[in-house]
Amino acid sequence: MRRNLTPFFFLLPALTLMVPFVIYPVFKTIYLSFFLGDKFVGLENYKNVLLSPDIVNLERFPTKSPPWGALIHNIVWIAIHLPTTIFLGLGFALLLRKKEVKGSSIIKSIIFLGMVIPMVVGGLIIRFLFEEGAGVIPAFFKLIGIEKLAITWTAYPQTALFSVILGSIWIWTGFSMLMYSAGLASIPKDYYEAALIDGANKFQIFRFVIWPLLRPITVVIVAMTLLWDLKIFDIVYVATGGGPGGASMVLALQMWDYFARSLNYNYAAVVAVLLTALTFIPALWLIKRRG
């Protein structure tokens, strides 16, 4: 009996920390989501939050400029950010995998820099890059004669959301590049040599040799990117604050807004529960695929 209980004694320190800091807050958040003040309202809070233009604004989406609602902003973020970072990460990994490429290590370090710096610093960099008169992006559009985009992107509803999405692509591309670089390094050279002997060209080698072997890594990258896109907070908070007028508001920031600005703890709890449920989808998908 004592031997059977030994593992539980080793778990006690972790459980002692998890109960007050993880388990209790989770159940307390779920509890608050069903109340309005001290009154039990069931699913009424969920109905009000999901129908709120703060979360989904179908009157403006997709015919008008943002704000479209925090949930739609997250979906747009995923639709742009996920495929772009995978494509760029894979592209850079393929181009820089050979040691013969001059400066490949330096280029990789620059690309991966976005993952190393704190997200708060990343948000400040994004705000600076898209600032009129100082940023690289407005200066570029002014140089090529597109004056409409030579503005402070974070200050206008039409461009604020896309400025933080584009900035986050630089931040996250380093992660996918690093993962794909590790995957490419693990592929034996014999596979390439066998394909060349069989008369395969570069595209066929990528399609039938490289890509199938990189699929498990791609699953991990997709799941991790989805989780990051859903819980994104800090760079948006620093770069735009969710503005102007909620044009770049995302779910995690909307949750904070309900909690800290509106002092509506019940609505904040609802968004927290919804956000947790959404993050479970890629997490469970990853576990299933890896299993």
Swiss-Prot record:
Name the source's superkingdom: Archaea
Q: Any transmembrane segments, and where?
A: 7-27, 75-95, 106-126, 133-153, 160-180, 208-228, 232-252, 267-287
**Primary localisation category:** membrane
What CDD domains does the database record attribute to this sequence?
A: TM_PBP2
GO annotation, cellular component aspect? plasma membrane
* Gene3D superfamilies documented for this protein: MetI-like
- Annotated ABC transmembrane type-1 domain ranges read 71-286
- The answer to whether the entry has keyword Cell wall biogenesis/degradation is no
Give membrane topology per the record: Multi-pass membrane protein
Query: Where located?
Result: Cell membrane
Pfam family name, one: BPD_transp_1
Keywords linked to the UniProt accession:
Cell membrane, Membrane, Transmembrane, Transmembrane helix, Transport
| GO BP terms | transmembrane transport
Entry similarity comment? Belongs to the binding-protein-dependent transport system permease family. MalFG subfamily.
- Provide the function of this protein: Probably part of a binding-protein-dependent transport system PH1036/38/39. Probably responsible for the translocation of the substrate across the membrane.
Q: What is the designated name of this protein? A: Probable ABC transporter permease protein PH1038
